[in-house]
Amino acid sequence: MMIGKLWRSVGTVGKFDGRYDGVRTMVGKASNRAGVHVTDTVLFEETSFEFSPSLTPELNEFPMPSLDVITPQAYLTPLGSQSINHAKFLQIPWRQFVFTKPLGLSKSTKLDEAVTLIENSSSSPSNLSTPEAYTDLLHACISAKSLHHGIKICSLILNNPSLRHNPKLLSKLITLFSVCRRLDLARKIFDDVTDSSLLTEKVWAAMAIGYSRNGSPRDALIVYVDMLCSFIEPGNFSISVALKACVDLKDLRVGRGIHAQIVKRKEKVDQVVYNVLLKLYMESGLFDDARKVFDGMSERNVVTWNSLISVLSKKVRVHEMFNLFRKMQEEMIGFSWATLTTILPACSRVAALLTGKEIHAQILKSKEKPDVPLLNSLMDMYGKCGEVEYSRRVFDVMLTKDLASWNIMLNCYAINGNIEEVINLFEWMIESGVAPDGITFVALLSGCSDTGLTEYGLSLFERMKTEFRVSPALEHYACLVDILGRAGKIKEAVKVIETMPFKPSASIWGSLLNSCRLHGNVSVGEIAAKELFVLEPHNPGNYVMVSNIYADAKMWDNVDKIREMMKQRGVKKEAGCSWVQVKDKIQIFVAGGGYEFRNSDEYKKVWTELQEAIEKSGYSPNTSVVLHDVDEETKANWVCGHSERLATTYSLIHTGEGVPIRITKNLRVCADCHSWMKIVSQVTRRVIVLRDTKRFHHFVDGICSCKDYW
């Protein structure tokens, strides 16, 4: 079927839903014939996909030549005028004219001159009326996104019989109009082509990328399939465009079909295609398939490595990510600052301080000056590994600081409980003329909440509105509720919730529920829990917290009711998980697990010695944290199997004497483990840094930085 008939049968652009289903069926059959597995049901991640210009520049803009070459003085008028000497300019190659920057002329003025010149020469044969000349001028219009000039050039091309049948010019016109957000004009150029031989792969690709560029990936994919129906062999660029559309649509089925076409191709597949295919599988959560594509690539550039590392970082597959980074170094791949900026947040998430320091060493060894985002990530990594002093060192040596730099440093102090440093840095920030924003005040207010600085926190909330003109957002009200609730001012916290200009979120009710846990307020806690069960019916943390409130009040029947409610709703308590980095490996421990380690002779020896030492210091298990109706001995054994205790014992065995122990946990630390950690830090003379979901706990010589307030 001819392409014109295909499109006319569809009607208005954008009404392609039915045809898209046909596309999926067609490509799916093709993939099955090629032996590429197709699944009808795939669990997709909700993460949106943004294409990086550095990954696939062809998918966003056609590469543009530089416009910054200075015009030779010989081609200006002898009197020094800024106008162009047309007689002399007709003698120079066209490319040197279009991509030349006459002294004192803006790019807009330069395009005006160029278009005027080519309009004047269009009526007579000259070296300015060639396809090459128009191609270069269209390049300039695309670069400047100049629709006004583009329409003039389009008119000249379409009225010139020797130019309007040039596929390269057609593709450039389509690109120009799509870049200028005029898909209607791009589509008209495409549809008005009556000679199918002019619809080359580049023209089809230009139309497809036009749709993709303007947020219509489904239409881009339909153009690609129509091209196949017209017996046009897709090239690497067209395949890249189609795969990008699959990524945007999260359509793995069609993507696998295109993968099948790639497998059958005899031509060499370039890295751009593989990079997009890699992204498709990674964004679909199919990391094993993505790794197969990666391992099967004959050539891999830094973009390819960065793509895989980035997704592994986002999905918290940290061990694989670290191994890939080391392999990248072994293969002498020159990583960019973007690589390190991607890895550092992963180090932050699992408190991988050793790997973070390794990256810092790479930065120091490099001759290239690190950019601000990289230093911000480095600062954040140290803060979230509990090394706030190193964060401050990085902050102090930064020659250029943006607002994010100040906010990160404030947050590093806040999460580590250094409220005095938070206040001092904030005052310095104001004196330096840096205007705070909403993120600044989240760090400040959360720091006040964690350290019990109630009055200062309340005054800061007012200053935010009156002095700094920052309108409080929902997260600021959540901090305010937390500040009041933790101080025992439950009624005031409830009043804030009732009068604030936002509908209370789960974080608001969660803050209130935690305050009720701290102060044993059952009645208000039940109100908060009721709201949370509606907003987050499958969040086990809410059920556990209200169970703790009932358990502390010895209301065991209510504890049983909560447990039964969880069973009926299919809610399971999230398993406690802790991890530590020892040497270059991340060790993960799950509550009640680690049987092989717990049955080892080294564990039994250290654990026995440790328990004897802490019992002599007066420790006895607080079994109230166990909400099951079992005997006290069983409860004590369960508490001893909590993941942070396993991680601590492992670190005592496998690290040198005096080396700080750093643990990250996926849940809030329980009261008994908190007491246990304090005594362990005292009897072993070790600094223990535990980061739970709420804050940092620095245990030093039997004292915690949170002052038992968390």
Curated annotation (Swiss-Prot):
Reply yes or no: does the keyword Lipid metabolism apply.
Answer: no
Instruction: Output the Gene3D superfamilies linked to this UniProt entry.
Output: Tetratricopeptide repeat domain
Mind listing the GO molecular function terms for this protein? mRNA binding; zinc ion binding
- A Gene Ontology term for the protein's cellular component: chloroplast
- Renumbered residue ranges of the record's region Type E motif: 508-583
Where is region (Type E(+) motif) located?
584-615
Q: Which Pfam families match?
A: DYW_deaminase, E_motif, PPR, PPR_2
Listed under GO biological process in this entry are: chloroplast RNA modification; cytidine to uridine editing
User: Could you tell me which InterPro entries the record lists for this protein?
Assistant: DYW_dom (IPR032867), E_motif (IPR046848), Pentatricopeptide_rpt (IPR002885), PPR_At4g14850-like_plant (IPR046960), TPR-like_helical_dom_sf (IPR011990)
| Region Type DYW motif: start-end pairs | 616-710
* UniProtKB keywords: Repeat
Q: Which domain of life is it from?
A: Eukaryota
Name where the PPR repeats lie. 166-196, 200-234, 235-269, 270-304, 305-331, 336-370, 371-401, 402-436, 437-467, 473-503
Checking PROSITE patterns in the record gives:
PPR (PS51375)
By sequence similarity, the record places it as follows:
Belongs to the PPR family. PCMP-H subfamily.
What name has this protein been given in UniProt?
Pentatricopeptide repeat-containing protein At3g14330
Q: Which gene encodes it?
A: PCMP-H57
